[in-house]
Curated annotation (Swiss-Prot):
Its EC number is 3.4.25.1. InterPro entries: Ntn_hydrolases_N, Pept_T1A_subB, Proteasome_bsu_CS, Proteasome_sua/b, Proteasome_suB-type. Belongs to the peptidase T1B family. Induction: Up-regulated by interferon gamma (at protein level). GO terms for cellular component: cytosol; nucleoplasm; proteasome core complex; proteasome core complex, beta-subunit complex; spermatoproteasome complex. The 26S proteasome consists of a 20S proteasome core and two 19S regulatory subunits. The 20S proteasome core is composed of 28 subunits that are arranged in four stacked rings, resulting in a barrel-shaped structure. The two end rings are each formed by seven alpha subunits, and the two central rings are each formed by seven beta subunits. The catalytic chamber with the active sites is on the inside of the barrel. Component of the immunoproteasome, where it displaces the equivalent housekeeping subunit PSMB6. The modification N6-acetyllysine is found at residues 53, 109. The proteasome is a multicatalytic proteinase complex which is characterized by its ability to cleave peptides with Arg, Phe, Tyr, Leu, and Glu adjacent to the leaving group at neutral or slightly basic pH. The proteasome has an ATP-dependent proteolytic activity. This subunit is involved in antigen processing to generate class I binding peptides. This is Proteasome subunit beta type-9. It is found in: Cytoplasm; Nucleus. Residues 1-20 form a propeptide. It holds the Pfam family Proteasome.
């Protein structure tokens, strides 16, 4: 006998998996730093605590994922495939702007079907380090940008703390502090922090574990 309010066959609803998240990218002279938290959620459940939301598009071009996990990864995979072909045709690595345009075009073409926002950042020989936002098919280059559910908590901090001419280490610290502050406030952001530094010399990957995160007053 079923109790009142008990779930019945067919009454279960599958929650879409989201990278409710905090992502960020910062330019410096000679490269970029890209960072993200690692929490992935479905409704109120955390389904992955250490998901890497920094996806490579080419050798020195990465994107940071937010929105629906499946949609964001699908856009990244399609863009990476097109950029690989583009690089083979040109016989040289694609430009960061070209990668951002590919992501922008895919996002706009499928804007009614896909729920995702990607930040594209990287280094090329023509323009050096570059950061692009691609929300809703828009394309804009910025010295730094943030996105995801946690970003609304840190706009004041990043506007006050950013300064032109920062070193790579200062950019990493700036990114780590901003994402940590967002993780402290946003229930959909959490876990560890992934950082990627991209320069002419290559790509440097770092992971900031929970016990290594900076401490702030609210804690």
């Amino acid at each position: 006998m079923l109790r009142a309010g008990a779930p019945t066959a067919g009454s279960f609803r599958t929650e879409e998996v989201h990278t409710g998240t905090t992502i960020m990218a910062v330019e410096f002279d000679g490269g970029v730093v890209v960072g993200s938290d690692s929490r992935v959620s479905a409704g109120t459940a955390v389904v992955n605590r250490v998901f890497d939301k920094l996806s490579p598009l080419h050798q020195r071009i990465f994107c940071a994922l937010s929105g629906s996990a499946a949609d964001a990864q699908a856009i990244a995979d399609m863009a990476a495939y097109q950029l690989e072909l583009h690089g083979l045709e040109l016989e040289e690595p694609p430009l960061v702007l070209a990668a951002a345009n590919v992501v922008k075009n895919i996002s706009y073409k499928y804007r009614e079907d896909l729920l995702a926002h990607l930040i594209v950042a990287g280094w090329d020989q023509r323009e050096g380090g570059q950061v692009y936002g691609t929300m809703g098919g828009m394309l804009i280059r910025q010295p730094f940008t943030i996105s995801g559910s946690g970003s609304s908590y840190i706009y004041g901090y990043v506007d006050a703390a950013y300064k032109p001419g920062m070193t790579p280490e200062e950019c990493r610290r700036f990114t780590t502090n901003a994402i940590t502050l967002a993780m402290n406030r946003d229930g959909s952001s959490g876990g560890v922090i992934y950082l990627v530094t991209i320069t002419a010399a290559g790509v440097d990957h770092r992971v900031i574990l929970g016990d290594e995160l900076p401490k702030f007053y609210d804690e």
